[in-house]
A protein has these predicted regions:
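Intrinsic-disorder-associated interaction segments
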Residues: 2, 67-70, 74, 156-160, ...
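Generic detector of well-ordered alpha-helical segments enriched in charged/polar residues
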Residues: 7-10, 75-82, 151, 164-168, ...
Length: 194
């Protein structure tokens, strides 16, 4: 979220069982919940301290139109954030199934939402952004690959697990770059979401 106030994020997410956490323990909790509690629909996101005007929420349901309950959960969690903050972005990857996803909302509206896994376009809404083109991603149209597009998608590394991070760096902040950034130490929060 484009904000320097993580407390607003906590309020909008209707946080339960909130605890302070440093980056390491917060990321560990989010990662554990994503892998161990996913089937129980329990999420334990980490809400970061501000980084260059952005607050990260790590460990929320993925953007995946092909799985309706997950998509509804994503919508329910992000709707108040999109309505409140000037810009909201979402990114995801899971290398086991070549899952990649990204989404960008500005001024209360999703401008771009894209998700792909296992050779299938799960979601493709909004126009491709200049930053996606800058990364060499082909402009896919619709929800299915046209003739030759799948091969072109593979050739441009569209499903590379680092693609969402690269795009995050062009849209805002690449989380992979955090260790090299000159940012003040900070404490965030972990919370429980059902």
């Amino acid at each position: 979220m484009k904000t320097a106030e993580p407390e607003q994020v906590l309020t909008l997410l209707k946080a339960q069982d909130v605890r302070r956490a440093n980056w390491q323990s917060g990321i560990d909790a989010a990662y554990w919940a994503c892998h161990e509690k996913y089937q129980e629909n329990i999420y334990v996101p980490f809400i970061s301290p501000p980084v260059r005007g952005w607050v990260f929420v790590v460990g929320v349901p993925p953007l995946e139109a092909a799985h309706l309950p997950t998509t509804q959960r994503f919508e329910a969690l992000t709707a108040p954030l999109v309505a409140h903050f000037p810009e909201v972005q979402a990114f995801g990857s899971y290398r086991v199934v070549d899952y990649v996803a990204w989404a960008k909302a500005v001024d209360g509206q999703w401008l771009r939402r894209f998700a792909y896994a296992d050779g299938e376009i799960l979601q493709n809404e909004g126009a491709q952004t200049a930053e996606e083109r800058q990364l060499g991603l082909i402009d896919l149209h619709g929800s299915e690959f046209a003739e030759g597009e799948f091969e072109a998608w593979v050739d441009c590394d569209g499903s590379d697990e680092y693609m969402p991070l690269k795009l995050a760096g062009l849209w805002s902040v690449n989380p992979d770059d955090l260790p090299e950034m000159d940012i003040a130490p900070g404490i965030g929060w972990v919370e429980r979401i059902f």
